[in-house]
Amino acid sequence: MDRIRIVGGNELNGIIPISGAKNAALPLMIASLLTSDTLTLENVPHLADVELLMRILGNHGVDVAVNGRRERQEDSYSRTIHFTCRTIVDTTASYELVSKMRASFWVIGPLLAREGHCRVSLPGGCAIGTRPVDLFIEGLTALGATMEIDAGYINAKAPNGGLIGARYTFPKVSVGATHVVMMAATLARGTTVIGNAAREPEVVDLANCLNAMGAKISGAGTATITIEGVTSLSGARHRVLPDRIETGTYAMAVAMAGGDVVLENTDVALLDTALETLRRAGADISATNNGMRVKRNGAGIKPVDIVTDPFPGFPTDLQAQFMALMTRSSGISHVTETIFENRFMHVQELARLGARITLSGQTAKIEGVQRLRGAPVMATDLRASVSLVIAGLAAEGETTVSRVYHLDRGFERLEEKLTRCGAVVERISE
């Protein structure tokens, strides 16, 4: 099993190209099930989750064609992939594959909309809380579907003639459920209005792609999304938006290690709240023509309190990384997690490096320390794993992170990008 070895104490200086967003690419890939034409996606990151979803889509009848091999050029990290689903050959999404990645459960929306029925395993993925599927079930039921849970599977059936447009308001914001109901509603009869919809940029990206395919969606990026159903969707060509979580992660890495790094192929508008929080912590961040510049030269790290919230609030997917940064602050900070109920699994691993963190319910109190010391640590989930890498960049001596398959699910060639900026980071294969 691979490990990541980090020797701390080196500033980061250089250029890091940001990959396409995993959280946008996955629903965009699943949208290929809605049409018999070819959907071409540019800027698709090379990640374990993307590879797994390609296998899952292939089982449903999607032909996947990748444009050549991944180029080893400085600015070439992501790929162009063509998805063609002439006929859906299997409406069952098996436990064997779906249990490995929660987002693969989202095929339930397009399969139900296009075929009128499907059998989809309950999901797996990161071990963060319970992450129930109730919101998905309620949203699709509002469109007229009947949903039955049997032996770990959901048997879904649309009414005769297909799904029916409706008004539905989510009791709580859910990005995944917004994706699924929006995709399903594109082929429903009549108009669907989704209330309390997720406002994340990835939702907007999916809506833009669906509109390019012939859907009629308005309001994406607000709390109310309106979808006028159409009889069919066509193919399209769409570029996956930059990964705001990867952007924020590397910005926090620079704030932690110090240095001066340009993040290319990204957009400051994608994460205003997180970047403003980083500025308060002492980072110097400015927009460039094709991204942003992040600097922290000499100044210490200031303590800042955060509360995670749905977009445009502070992203839960950057919570662990920010906590790692706060371990080196000059005072006491607090991190409150409101999205997931069990997203502090990285705390005990950061403590192995010398961090002082105490938990009280959904709030972590972090007392900044003058130094961290390298040690063997273990990744517990995707975002927690990269927080350990960030901490290792500033720790004295050597830090080794095991179970890095979590990293490979969401960060494209992380060790290569950091090494190019002066970090001592290497992958050790065993």
Curated annotation (Swiss-Prot):
List of residues binding UDP-N-acetyl-alpha-D-glucosamine: R102, R131, P132, V133, D134, L135, K172, V173, S174, V175, D317, I339
Record keyword Transcription regulation present: no
GO cellular component term of the entry, any: cytoplasm
Domain of life: Bacteria
Localisation per UniProt entry: Cytoplasm
Active-site residues, Swiss-Prot/TrEMBL: C126 (proton donor)
Protein function: Cell wall formation. Adds enolpyruvyl to UDP-N-acetylglucosamine.
Assigned protein family: Belongs to the EPSP synthase family. MurA subfamily.
Name the UniProt record assigns to this protein: UDP-N-acetylglucosamine 1-carboxyvinyltransferase
